[in-house]
């Protein structure tokens, strides 16, 4: 790959990643719902990531029960998360990120569950186990540079800059 093409790709901005809290639900405590629920505390969709506030937007989604029952076994909570919130641990490896990283994930999970309780009252008491992932998790398992959820950020004002041809000359 030509160096100029590689530099161009490297200079393009990626989209946000997300923080995910996957919750294993206690048996027969939450009935299955066949839709995603979006929760927004504030309408500022363009600048929210610049603020250092608790989680204020959330996607609540549940899997179809594998056992065919009417009760949920897992609920996933997703909220946008920028790379900058994890950058302090970018040099670390999976499972070796330290207590501050674990504390940050626990705090984020608590904020997500608390916000989700607006839609599912009593969710805290329904959780048997929880697992979390951050942009670092996505980076390490999917090899996206900053754990990006949707790849390169597109610019409708200048679409040509983010258009990458699938055919490039091989030197």
Predicted regions and their residues:
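Mid-domain catalytic core of redox enzymes
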Residues: 1-70
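A glycine-rich dinucleotide-binding beta-alpha-beta segment and adjacent secondary-structure elements
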Residues: 118-171
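Conserved FAD/dinucleotide-binding core of flavoprotein oxidoreductases
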Residues: 24, 70-111
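Short, low-complexity, polar/charged sequence segments that are solvent-exposed and flexible
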Residues: 39-44, 94-102, 146-149
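Composition- and surface-driven signal marking solvent-exposed, interaction-prone regions
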Residues: 35-37, 73, 90-92, 128-129
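Flavin (FAD/FMN)-binding glycine-rich loop and adjacent Rossmann-like elements that form
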Residues: 49, 53-54, 63, 67, ...
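Flavin-binding catalytic cores
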Residues: 28-29, 70, 97-136
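C-terminal structured subdomain/cap of oxidoreductase catalytic cores
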Residues: 1-2, 9-12, 18-30, 76-81, ...
């Amino acid at each position: 790959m030509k160096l100029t093409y590689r530099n161009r790709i490297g200079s393009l901005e990626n989209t946000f990643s997300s923080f995910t809290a996957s919750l294993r639900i206690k048996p027969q405590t939450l009935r299955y719902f066949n839709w995603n629920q979006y929760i927004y505390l504030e309408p500022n969709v363009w600048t929210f990531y610049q603020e250092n506030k608790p989680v204020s937007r959330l996607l609540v989604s549940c899997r179809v029960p594998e056992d065919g029952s009417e009760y949920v076994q897992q609920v996933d909570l997703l909220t946008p998360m920028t790379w900058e919130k994890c950058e302090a641990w970018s040099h670390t490896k999976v499972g070796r990120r330290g207590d501050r990283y674990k504390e940050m994930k626990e705090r984020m999970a608590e904020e997500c569950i608390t916000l989700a309780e607006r839609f599912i009252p009593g969710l805290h008491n329904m959780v048997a186990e929880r697992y979390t992932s951050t942009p670092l998790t996505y980076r390490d398992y999917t090899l996206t540079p900053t754990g990006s959820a949707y790849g390169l950020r597109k610019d409708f004002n200048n679409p040509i800059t983010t258009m990458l041809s699938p055919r490039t000359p091989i030197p």
